[in-house]
Structures are given as structure tokens and as C-alpha cells.
């Protein structure tokens, strides 16, 4: 979990902005979206294969 300590004379907005940035950098939101619904292993393999194919042809 990301943790941000509010500095002296720092506004809440800037602390919140730093917190959001640290969450995005650590990949918390992406992980939450990925785990939101169960995905069968066969579907995971298919998506991974499709992504590799798209990268190859770009």
C-alpha cells in the first residue's frame, strides 16, 4: 500500500496528488482492475497470445 506523509505547510491537495502519483507508479489501480472479476486460465493465455501477436505486427 502506498503511504504519503503530509509535510509541514503542505496543502491537502498536493499531498493527495503525490499519493495518487505513487499509487499509479506502484500499479495498485491496474492490479485492482485486473482482479475485479475472475478470469479463467484459458482466457488469460488467449489474451496474452493476442497481445504478443499485436506487438509482433506493429
From Swiss-Prot:
PROSITE patterns: RIBOSOMAL_S21. Residues 35-58 are annotated as: Disordered. GO terms for molecular function: structural constituent of ribosome. Residues 43-58 have a biased composition (Basic residues). One of its GO terms (cellular component) is ribonucleoprotein complex. GO terms for biological process: translation. Pfam families: Ribosomal_S21. The keyword Ribonucleoprotein applies. InterPro entries: Ribosomal_bS21 (IPR001911), Ribosomal_bS21_CS (IPR018278), Ribosomal_bS21_sf (IPR038380). Keywords: Ribonucleoprotein, Ribosomal protein. Belongs to the bacterial ribosomal protein bS21 family. This is Small ribosomal subunit protein bS21. The lineage of its organism: Bacteria, Bacillati, Bacillota, Clostridia, Eubacteriales.
